[in-house]
Amino acid sequence: MKYSLIFILTLACLIASSLARPEGEEKPADDAAGDKKEEGAEGDKTAAGGDEGFTGGDGKNAGGAGNPMKVVQDIIKKITDAVNPLRMTEGFLGGGGSGGSGALFG
């Protein structure tokens, strides 16, 4: 049972990493459709203050809100942060935010 859980988690991580793309890459479907966009054109509009309040409403730059893989990665990060043994002992070792006064190494 323990090994099957490890196998499933490993498989899920491999699939997630293989589906992940760097932020600069476009989707393969966009390339196949012939949509030729200049890179940085939308960002230049927002930097220049043009296009009357353009906020990047296409969902691509909305912090991953429309990206299901980003949601999965955020969930995995929250779980690993919750069970991280170093965070559990943070108050004991003196890494807390109480003015730098910790119990052991503060």
From Swiss-Prot:
Primary localization: secreted
Signal sequence coordinates: 1-20
Compositional bias of kind Basic and acidic residues: 22-45
Region (Disordered) location: 20-66
Assigned keywords, A-Z: Secreted, Signal
Compartmental location: Secreted
Biased composition (Gly residues): 50-66
Keyword Secreted tagged: yes
A single Gene Ontology CC term: extracellular region
Entry keyword Nucleotide-binding: no
Protein name as annotated: Glycine/glutamate-rich protein sgp1
Lineage: Eukaryota, Metazoa, Ecdysozoa, Arthropoda, Hexapoda
Gene: sgp1
